[in-house]
UniProtKB/Swiss-Prot annotation:
CDD domains given in the database record: Era_like (cd00880)
Residue ranges occupied by any G domain in the UniProt entry: 17-137
Name of the protein: Uncharacterized protein MJ0920
GO molecular function: GTP binding
SUPFAM superfamilies referenced in this protein's UniProt entry, alphabetically: P-loop containing nucleoside triphosphate hydrolases
Residue pairs linked by disulfide bridges in the UniProt entry: none
NCBIfam families, sorted: small_GTP
PANTHER family assigned: TRNA MODIFICATION GTPASE GTPBP3, TRNA MODIFICATION GTPASE GTPBP3, MITOCHONDRIAL
Domain of life the protein comes from: Archaea
Length: 185
């Protein structure tokens, strides 16, 4: 019997830290990172590893965990990214459609963009995909800013975010735990 593939697409605006989060999840450099927005154009797919998810000892069930780093659909000023040509946009939405789960990355220093709020609702209700909302760059936020952003995100998209820092690895183990718990449910 062939192991199933469980694909997780990482989405967010340009420079939100999607590639950095992917690198942090892998514990090594697997996706190009740059200060310049639009570095990731075509989706970058990486095999994370095999996870045992079955509970039956005699017939263990495994899943191949795959992460897909997608280019930023929008800029931090809420405009469509210039890298999103029709071909790139089509490939990006193919990957989103084929994914089993979404990690929606919000840049903590910018906040939730209206365009991503709309995309979040589309993914949640039309595609009915599980979505983990991640607020990156939490190392740049004080406790008051974190609380305000958390409340705003919960109110706007009805999803409790987790705070991570791809730079300091804060929250990365918790993100992996959430993914693994979802798979083992």
């Amino acid at each position: 019997m062939q192991d199933k593939e469980f694909k997780i697409a990482i989405i967010g605006p340009e420079n939100a830290g999607k590639s950095s989060i992917m690198n942090a999840l892998f514990g090594k450099y697997v996706s190009l990172v740059s200060e310049v927005g639009g570095t990731t154009k075509m989706p970058i797919k990486r095999y994370w590893g095999k996870l045992k998810i079955g509970r039956i000892k005699e017939e263990p069930e495994f899943v191949n965990l795959v992460f897909v780093d997608l280019g930023g659909l929008y800029t931090t000023t809420d405009k469509q990214s210039p890298i999103m040509t029709p071909k790139v946009l089509e490939k990006t939405f193919e990957e989103i459609n084929d994914s089993d789960m979404i990690i929606h990355v919000i840049d903590g220093s910018v906040g939730l963009l209206r365009s991503f709020e709309r995309l979040h609702h589309l993914l949640k209700f039309r595609y009915q995909k599980p979505i983990i909302v991640v607020i990156n760059k939490c190392d740049l936020l004080n406790d008051s800013d974190k609380e305000h952003l958390k409340n705003y995100v919960e109110r706007r998209i009805k999803n409790t975010p987790i705070f991570v820092s791809a730079k300091t690895f804060e929250g990365i183990p918790e993100l992996l735990d959430i993914i693994i718990k979802y798979l083992k449910r």
